[in-house]
């Protein structure tokens, strides 16, 4: 349990510490909502320093379909009208790892009951949503990668100028000194 709590705390710390104190940062969160990412998403939405302009789903803690459903369910819980785009269902090159149901439960949210959402994800893919949003707001949108970075790689393949138009990319990218995201693809 200590490793899991440390992992959650590190995720939230990295998310909030990455942004300046004075400016409200506009972000797209690219996420595989398990219990840890769900907490980070809710903290970001509640923060007066962050404006979440979109959520993208990705495989990782759960499969992409469930990640999309979980993102929509979380947004309904807090009555947040934020668009959700469904992302890649597999890595570009590496073998897809099994989902850690022993940590996040079969539903990805720790087996707590959260009502299904009546909302749907955008018709755009996550990569298309990233490109459209960043290129329409050059230098204003940051990307927060809480899961695998496949959607960001696909967005860069669609629009190489994305690299010079995104404000910054903040990636969780693994853990230190605790069990967790310590694999060759973390």
Model-based region annotation:
Residues 9, 13-14, 64:
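Contiguous, function-dense segments enriched for cysteine-driven chemistry
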Residues 85-117:
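Surface-exposed loop and adjacent secondary-structure segments within mature catalytic domains
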Residues 1-10:
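Bacterial N-terminal signal peptides that target proteins for export
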Residues 14-22:
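Hydrophobic h-region of N-terminal signal peptides that target proteins for export
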Residues 78-85:
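A glycine-rich helix N-cap at a beta->alpha junction
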Residues 24-30, 35-73, 106-108, 112-186:
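Active-site histidine-anchored catalytic micro-motif
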């Amino acid at each position: 349990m200590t490793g899991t709590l440390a992992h959650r705390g590190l995720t939230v710390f990295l998310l909030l510490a990455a942004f300046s104190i004075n400016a409200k940062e506009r972000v797209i969160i690219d996420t595989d909502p398990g219990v840890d990412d769900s907490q980070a998403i809710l903290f970001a939405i509640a923060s007066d320093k962050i404006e979440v302009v979109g959520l993208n789903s990705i495989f990782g803690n759960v499969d992409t379909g469930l990640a999309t459903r979980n993102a929509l369910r979380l947004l309904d819980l807090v009555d947040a009208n934020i668009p959700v785009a469904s992302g890649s269902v597999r890595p570009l090159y590496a073998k897809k790892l099994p989902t850690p149901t022993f940590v996040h439960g079969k539903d990805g949210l720790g087996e707590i009951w959260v009502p299904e959402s009546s909302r749907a994800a955008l018709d755009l893919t996550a990569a298309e949503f990233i490109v459209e949003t960043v290129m329409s707001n050059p230098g204003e949108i940051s990307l927060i990668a809480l899961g695998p970075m496949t959607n960001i790689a696909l967005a860069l393949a669609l629009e190489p100028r994305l690299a010079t138009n995104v404000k910054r990319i903040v990636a969780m990218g693994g853990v230190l000194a605790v069990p967790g995201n310590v694999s060759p693809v973390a």
